[in-house]
C-alpha cells in the first residue's frame, strides 16, 4: 500500500478500538457488508451457487478477522501433524501479491514476487507440493493432477472462498477475538464469527486463552531461536542459544506481518533487548528499509524469503540479518479432532 493508504488504514483501525464519529459513520457500510456476506453464504448453502468438490478431503484454514491471526503457521503445523499421521498433504493458497493469475506450482526457485511470500515460505518449511492461484479450485485440481500421491489438501486463507467444498474449517483467532464485533469497515470482522457452514468447524486460538465465546483449542506459539540469513537459505535450523554479540546492546527487529508487535514480544521473551522496526504486512523490500548504520537486524521468515543473500551482500555488505522462525505447538486434542473429522481419500 501507499503511504496515504497505510495512514488511512491505521486511522480506521484506531477507530475500531476507540469508537467515535468515524466508527459510527462506517456502521451503515458494515451492515451492507453483513447482508452481502450472509446472502452469499446462503446462495452457496441452498445450491443456487455451485460448490466444487475435489478428489481428496479438504481442510480450509482461515480467520474471521482482517489482519494476521496466525493462518500460515497454523497451516504449517497442520501439515506437519498430517504427515506424522501418515497422510500426504498438499497446500493451495492464493499467493498474496503474486503477479500471475493462473494456477502454478511453488518451487525452491520461485520468488515472492511471482508466487507470494507466504506460499514460498510454506514450500520451504513444509517440503510438500504447494500451488497458488486466485481460483483455489483450479489450483487444487492442478496440484492433484501433478501430484497424485497427495491424499489431503490444506487450503491456506480460504475461509471465504466458498466455491471450494471443504470437509473441515479451521478458524483461527488471536488475542483480539472478534474485536468490536462489527464487520468491515466499521470493525475487523470479514464475516460473522458464527457464520453457518456445512463443514465441520474447529476453532483454534493463537492465544493463551479463548478470545471469543466459541469453544476451541489453544495453540502455543514460540520462536525457535535465531539463524543467520545465509545459513537459513541453506536449510539450517535456528539455535535456541543466542549469539553473544546480540545480548550486549539493543538490536533492530523488523517485521512486515499483520501483527508485528506479537513478533517483538516473542523476541523479548528470548531475553533480547530490541528496537522495533514495524513494516506493512507483505512489505516488498524494493529498497532495504533500515538505517545505513545498522549492523544487525532480526526478521521473520515471511520477510526472509524476500531477502536474497546475494542482494544483501551487494547492497549492504556490513549488515547481518538474523531469521527468527515461528513454531506452533498444536494441542493433542486439536489434532485428534482434526484427524477424526477427515474422511478417507475419495475415489476420483
From Swiss-Prot:
It comes from the Bacteria. Keywords: ATP-binding, Kinase, Lipid A biosynthesis, Lipid biosynthesis, Lipid metabolism, Nucleotide-binding, Transferase. GO terms for biological process: lipid A biosynthetic process; lipopolysaccharide core region biosynthetic process. ATP binds at residues 65-72. It catalyses: a lipid A disaccharide + ATP = a lipid IVA + ADP + H(+). The keyword Iron does not apply. Pathway: Glycolipid biosynthesis; lipid IV(A) biosynthesis; lipid IV(A) from (3R)-3-hydroxytetradecanoyl-[acyl-carrier-protein] and UDP-N-acetyl-alpha-D-glucosamine: step 6/6. InterPro entries: LpxK, P-loop_NTPase. Pfam families: LpxK. GO terms for molecular function: ATP binding; tetraacyldisaccharide 4'-kinase activity. Residues 89-117 are annotated as: Disordered. GO terms for cellular component: plasma membrane. Belongs to the LpxK family. This is Tetraacyldisaccharide 4'-kinase. It comes from Leptothrix cholodnii (strain ATCC 51168 / LMG 8142 / SP-6).
